[in-house]
């Protein structure tokens, strides 16, 4: 059974299913019991894999593109769960066939996996020391293909800057479990050829951010 909260309810279970509750309960338990980020993420992998392997828990509208999204390119970013204190979120990211995300970071540990379709991920390593908030020297460090049911970890600063392209015939849907309120925190968008960095907040397609007009924090 799947229940929805009103999209104006910014926090908690925006989509409430046993599968999502099972993952969030396990994540919160491990956040209390394990202090090391890498150990916590490793311990979370079975529960995350279980969610990726389950059918029927993701509503159709949260697996569809969004032509008005803050990510651009028809990319939909749909909140499924958000902790009120900003410590955890679960969301789906829908990328149309052939479309790519901007090159961006996440600023949080977590897990990302493909629920539907197939993606190519290009990961960057930052070569400069970050002293200039408007500039970045990036080099490609890895290129991966991620298929349905496969996932990878995020443990910033390692491998935190990337972009993703859908390489399947239809839109891809990835599921993100991250230790912040990802779409509502100020992150960074990169242009490697120009060497520039821009603060951005992608926003959710189905839930509002608090303090929409707040200036970005560098």
Set out the residue ranges of the language-model regions.
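N-terminal leader/capping segments at the start of a protein or of a new domain
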Residues: 1-56
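A short glycine-rich, His/Asp/Glu-containing loop-to-beta-strand
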Residues: 69-97
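Conserved short histidine dyad/triad with adjacent acidic residue
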Residues: 91-105, 155-159
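Glycine- and acidic-residue-biased ligand/ion/polar-headgroup-sensing regions
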Residues: 108-127
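A short hydrophobic beta-strand segment most commonly corresponding to one strand
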Residues: 111-113, 169-184
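Short acidic-glycine-tyrosine-enriched beta hairpin
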Residues: 126-161, 203
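Ligand-binding loop in jelly-roll beta-barrel domains
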Residues: 156-175
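Long hydrophobic alpha-helical segments typical of transmembrane helices together
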Residues: 190-218
